[in-house]
Amino acid sequence: MNIRPLHDRVIVKRLEVESKSAGGIVLTGSAAEKSTRGEILAVGNGRLLENGTVKPLDVKVGDVVIFNEGYGVKKEKIDGEEVLILSEADLMAVVG
């Protein structure tokens, strides 16, 4: 995958989760909830501060994160694979 996010943006591959109902039935498609966990595939250089310096991101390639899939999240297909482009501010936690 040849993509480089700009500024404080990251490229995330959503992690698959197996969704089961309370009765143990595996849910698929629209009945299953989408995961809000993903693996960081690429990171931008950082956020430009008012004093002109660049603050590096707190995450790195390979980190598993929990993200907020809100207004600023962009879905794209790169090399046939769906990825999410989002700002570091949309990341809520690093797992592990």
Swiss-Prot record:
Keyword set includes Cytoplasm: yes
Keyword Chaperone tagged: yes
One GO CC annotation: cytoplasm
InterPro entries cross-referenced by the UniProt entry: Chaperonin_GroES, Chaperonin_GroES_sf, Chaprnonin_Cpn10_CS, GroES-like_sf
UniProt keyword list: Chaperone, Cytoplasm
Domain of life (superkingdom): Bacteria
BP GO annotations: chaperone cofactor-dependent protein refolding
Alphabetized Gene3D superfamilies for the sequence: GroES chaperonin
GO molecular function, one term: ATP binding
Cellular location(s): Cytoplasm
Pfam families in the cross-refs: Cpn10
UniProt subunit comment: Heptamer of 7 subunits arranged in a ring. Interacts with the chaperonin GroEL.
Biological role stated in the UniProt entry: Together with the chaperonin GroEL, plays an essential role in assisting protein folding. The GroEL-GroES system forms a nano-cage that allows encapsulation of the non-native substrate proteins and provides a physical environment optimized to promote and accelerate protein folding. GroES binds to the apical surface of the GroEL ring, thereby capping the opening of the GroEL channel.
Database matches in PANTHER family: 10 KDA HEAT SHOCK PROTEIN, CO-CHAPERONIN GROES
NCBIfam families associated with the record: PRK00364.1-1, PRK00364.1-2, PRK00364.2-2
HAMAP family to which the protein is assigned, alphabetical: CH10
UniProt record similarity statement: Belongs to the GroES chaperonin family.
Name of the protein in its database record: Co-chaperonin GroES
Native source species: Shewanella denitrificans (strain OS217 / ATCC BAA-1090 / DSM 15013)
Gene behind the chain: groES
